[in-house]
């Protein structure tokens, strides 16, 4: 029997891009291709790129260059593949003319066509060797579940719609089947992702789908309830990311706080507020009522006291005054956001924000970002100290001689904090990766926790 052709794979960018990579790798394995862990062991290399900010563009271009140098046969996909250069030609083909093919994001079919053209598929693919959940690039105990593609918003700082298109929601039955297969495969935590999770179903007018004979609307609240019910059967977690602050988000909070889904639909919201001053939000083309947002955050916490709120912000947006920036700092203090990320505004090629007046010097943008993070760290440290002395449920991610590293319901992988768990004193309390354990919290800083089983 002849040796199977081998494909190397490089995956860059956000969790949405990671899911695209998983889908491509799943299809490659289904058709009998092997995945190579090295450039020199591969017959060709696929690079899945990111093109959102300048640093990501450069990282992607460097990765393509490295793959060309080390292997020579490279197919490029992802967001950067949809980006044009200043001359109007494809940016990747202009910088790296030797690439075999370039596609945009979410393009499994096009990538496979390119692979077939340059590396014909084997005659006997091993479809049965591919698990029902597909090939995953995350650890076995957690996985990303992408519920839609694209975005209908036109935020002035963002070019995602030009690369990934308008919102396209996946059929609810398809989403539920993937979730079930993931839980069956041993996944303990599903991270629901999209460009705009709250808008799920808008494009299909919230039409009714069916799962196991039950009607389920293509709508975030209904999907979350169905996922919560499924997760409860497996003792697993569901975590919500990229939740745009629509009024409909209010309906999800009770699912986190009470009833059969409590402890399965995690009390965690990743809400990209971006700013708090109405004038800045208006220039960003974002919802512009910070007072109402504060009221909603307070109401959410009344309903669900354990709620963790993560958000991202931009400091130094064009035209942002010192007074407007201070409004943002006040908002972070009053809202007591648990987890916060902040970017100093950086012009993105193709974004309409580039045409706005009032661009700030680099040093002002960076100084504001640093001040913002100081305030955010103070708020986070204060909230983290409240957890000392409590016993929390922790999902173990790593185990070593010095103990384990895990996460609570308040911590998403990669972006939030962790819990450092002491080694188990008794054999009966030993734990392994993917286990849920009860941990008494003994210490905290602004980001992480320490505890013992």
UniProtKB/Swiss-Prot annotation:
Gene3D superfamilies named in the record: Methylthiotransferase, N-terminal domain, Nucleic acid-binding proteins, tm_1862 like domain
Protein's name in the database: Ribosomal protein uS12 methylthiotransferase RimO
Catalytic activity: L-aspartate(89)-[ribosomal protein uS12]-hydrogen + (sulfur carrier)-SH + AH2 + 2 S-adenosyl-L-methionine = 3-methylsulfanyl-L-aspartate(89)-[ribosomal protein uS12]-hydrogen + (sulfur carrier)-H + 5'-deoxyadenosine + L-methionine + A + S-adenosyl-L-homocysteine + 2 H(+)
Keywords of the record: 4Fe-4S, Cytoplasm, Iron, Iron-sulfur, Metal-binding, S-adenosyl-L-methionine, Transferase
Species whose genome carries this gene: Burkholderia cenocepacia (strain ATCC BAA-245 / DSM 16553 / LMG 16656 / NCTC 13227 / J2315 / CF5610)
Binding annotation for [4Fe-4S] cluster 2: 151, 155, 158
Domain MTTase N-terminal positions: 5-120
Cofactor(s) the record lists: [4Fe-4S] cluster
HAMAP family: MTTase_RimO
Family to which this protein belongs: Belongs to the methylthiotransferase family. RimO subfamily.
A GO-annotated cellular component: cytosol
């Amino acid at each position: 029997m002849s040796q199977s052709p081998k494909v190397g794979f490089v995956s860059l960018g956000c969790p949405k891009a990671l899911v695209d990579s998983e889908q491509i790798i799943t299809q490659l394995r289904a058709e009998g291709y092997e995945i190579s862990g090295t450039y020199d062991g591969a017959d060709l290399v696929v690079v899945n790129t990111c093109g959102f900010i300048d640093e990501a563009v450069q990282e992607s271009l460097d990765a393509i260059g490295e793959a060309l140098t080390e292997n020579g046969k490279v197919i490029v996909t992802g967001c950067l593949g949809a980006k044009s250069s200043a001359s109007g030609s494809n940016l990747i083909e202009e910088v790296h003319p030797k690439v075999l093919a370039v596609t945009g994001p979410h393009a499994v079919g096009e990538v496979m066509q390119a692979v077939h053209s340059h590396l014909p598929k084997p005659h006997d693919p091993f479809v049965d060797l591919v698990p029902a959940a597909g090939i995953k690039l995350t650890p076995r105990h957690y996985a990303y579940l992408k519920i839609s593609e694209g975005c209908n918003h036109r935020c002035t700082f963002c070019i995602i719609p030009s690369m990934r298109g308008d919102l396209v929601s996946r059929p609810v039955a398809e989403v539920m089947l993937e979730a079930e297969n993931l839980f069956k495969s041993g996944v303990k935590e599903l991270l629901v992702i999209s460009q705009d999770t709250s808008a799920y179903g808008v494009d299909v007018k919230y039409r009714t789908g069916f799962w196991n004979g039950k009607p389920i609307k293509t709508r975030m609240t209904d999907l979350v309830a169905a996922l919560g019910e499924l997760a409860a059967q497996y003792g697993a977690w569901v975590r919500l990311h990229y939740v745009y602050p629509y009024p409909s988000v209010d309906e999800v909070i009770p699912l986190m706080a009470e009833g059969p889904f409590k402890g399965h639909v995690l009390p965690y919201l990743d809400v990209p507020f971006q700013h708090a001053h109405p004038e800045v939000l208006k220039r960003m083309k974002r919802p512009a009522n910070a007072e109402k947002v504060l009221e909603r955050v307070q109401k959410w916490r009344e309903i669900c006291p354990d709620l963790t709120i993560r958000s991202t912000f931009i400091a130094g947006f064009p035209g942002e005054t010192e007074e407007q920036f201070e409004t943002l700092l006040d908002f972070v203090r009053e809202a007591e956001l648990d987890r916060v990320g902040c970017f100093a505004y950086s012009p993105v090629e193709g974004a309409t924000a580039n045409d706005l007046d009032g661009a700030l010097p680099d040093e002002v943008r960076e100084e504001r970002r640093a001040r913002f993070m100081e305030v955010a760290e103070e708020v986070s440290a204060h909230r983290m100290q409240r957890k000392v002395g409590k016993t929390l449920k922790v999902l173990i991610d790593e185990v070593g001689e010095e103990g384990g590293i895990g996460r609570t319901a308040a911590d998403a992988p990669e972006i939030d904090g962790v819990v450092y768990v002491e080694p188990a004193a008794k054999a009966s309390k030993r734990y392994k990766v993917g286990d849920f354990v009860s941990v008494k919290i003994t210490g905290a800083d602004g980001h992480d926790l320490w505890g013992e089983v």
